């Protein structure tokens, strides 16, 4: 998710992007992490001290990383797995449920989330993210992931109609 989003923002939109990641043995369903720093200017330090946006695809990740979110930051959760949010201010979609029911593969959850994020982030465009998927994924799994992306994007457009207009930078 982080790599594809970062690639799309850097290559397709011209932003400066750095990514750091931590994928331990808990990577499936646990608190793995990918940090992106995105800026229109060169980046001085590659790791964020506080987060403008947090994507929590598991309860453990939400619990562990929420405290790093700025007071004005935005929280996006997979409502299939995150049932207790530390704030009432969040966006959410049942990403795991969408992946299971519409794609037939729970491993597509992160790409469903990417589709949803593309709707809510004003600086991400669907065509750019699709090209990023094409550039980063093997051909044998591309079609399935494009379907997952579209499912997440369309569901977010339906359930979060205001999308990017809700975003403000601090």
Residue ranges and their predicted role:
Residues 1-170:
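Active-site cofactor/cluster-binding pocket
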